[in-house]
A protein has these predicted regions:
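TPR alpha-solenoid repeat register
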Residues: 60, 94, 128, 161, ...
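Register position in tetratricopeptide repeats
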Residues: 36-37, 70-71, 104-105, 137-139, ...
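Canonical tetratricopeptide repeat
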Residues: 63-66, 96-97, 131, 164, ...
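Alpha-helical segment of the N-proximal tetratricopeptide repeat
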Residues: 22-56, 63-66, 70-73
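Short coil turns that delineate tetratricopeptide repeat
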Residues: 55, 89, 123, 156, ...
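Eukaryotic alpha-helical solenoid repeat scaffolds
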Residues: 157-337
Length: 337
């Protein structure tokens, strides 16, 4: 989360730099250099003087608070964070910074109030929903999932809420959303460490949750989501393929037949980007490689390495395709209700 804020600060700094007086701009650049090397004392010295020259500069104030935060001077950081979020021009990053400071001080109640204020101002901010949910989850408040679901609904292009929601559902009796959200996240963060760990949880979810009972609809009588029921019914039609156990190969067959059935019976009622993507891979002859990438290494790393060598051309084609596009969920495809 801190790395994401640093990236956002860097981007916002580049946009604001042109509007700064030349002297202040130079001071800000020097301060950023100190921050990058971990010399937060010097960063604070320079930023404090720069703020005196340009007291309305939001980017300077954000970096000053972050420098206090990284120095672990949380009292000063909190003082600055409160000033940041009280500004009329406070942006999402201001509230993210404040959230970090409150969490460091373990001031849960004040942090809770701050996130509520933030989401009232930015009701479409995925990062704020994600981080508010993380605060609640750390406090063992099961209402955390409501924040992550709201984040998915209001900002479907942000990956963090899919990650948190998938982890939450993996630890419940849910059979659907842990797999759906987990696979969406893996495609949004295909190269991250979190993405790699999520792939292992997906394979485990198919084995231990989805196909744990011979009757895949068992326990789903009270499921209010028509989308979830349609998903389970579609998967259930292929359950005989699990008679010899679950493997990457059997999952590929199950998921192939599921996609064909989905587009015959449910796609018009429930358009869904993840399934569109799977269908595209199927049509272009890359679905087998995709499933190997998704499940193979978690099932058996040596076997997966052998597969990539034996199917080098197929694997290379998928890898190039994967690196050439960015996967994002669009608005209007939220089916939890």
């Amino acid at each position: 989360m801190i790395q994401r804020i640093i990236l956002l600060l860097a981007l916002s700094f580049s946009l604001a730099a042109a509007a700064q007086p030349e002297e202040v701009k130079k001071m800000h650049e020097n301060a950023k250099a100190f921050m990058r090397t971990g010399d937060f004392d010097n960063a604070i010295i320079v930023l404090t003087r720069a703020v005196q020259k340009d007291s309305k500069n939001l980017e300077l104030q954000k970096d000053l608070v972050m420098s206090y935060y990284f120095k672990r001077d949380y009292a000063k950081a909190l003082e600055g964070a409160k000033e940041l979020i009280d500004r009329d021009d406070a942006d999402v990053v201001c509230f993210q910074i404040a959230g970090n400071v409150y969490k460091a001080l373990e001031e849960v109640k004040d942090c809770d109030k701050m996130y509520k204020k933030a989401l009232k101002k930015f009701p479409k901010s995925g990062p704020l929903y994600s981080e508010y949910g993380e605060l609640l989850w750390a406090a063992k408040d099961m209402q955390a999932i409501r924040q992550w679901e709201e984040g998915i609904k209001n900002d479907p292009g942000y990956s963090g809420n899919y990650y948190n929601a998938a982890l939450y559902y993996f630890y419940t009796k849910d059979k659907v959303w842990s797999l759906i959200y987990g696979e969406i996240f893996v495609n949004m963060e295909s190269l991250s460490e979190r993405g790699a760990s999520m792939k292992g949880m997906l394979l485990q979810g198919y084995k231990e949750k989805l196909f744990a009972d011979a009757d895949i609809m068992k326990g789903e009588e009270k499921n209010k989501s028509e989308f979830a029921k349609a998903f389970l019914q579609g998967i259930g039609k292929q359950s005989t393929l699990t008679n010899n156990g679950i493997s990457t190969e059997t999952l590929t067959m199950i998921r192939t037949r599921f996609i064909l059935d989905w587009y015959e019976n449910n796609a018009l009622k429930f358009p869904y980007k993840l399934f569109d993507f799977q269908r595209q891979l199927l049509q272009e002859g890359m679905f087998n490689a995709y499933n190997q990438w998704l499940f193979g290494a978690s099932e058996n790393l040596a076997a997966y390495d052998n597969w990539t060598k034996a199917h080098a051309e197929e694997y290379e084609a998928f890898s190039k395709f994967q690196k050439s596009r960015i996967f994002k969920m669009p608005a209007g495809q939220y089916y939890q209700n």
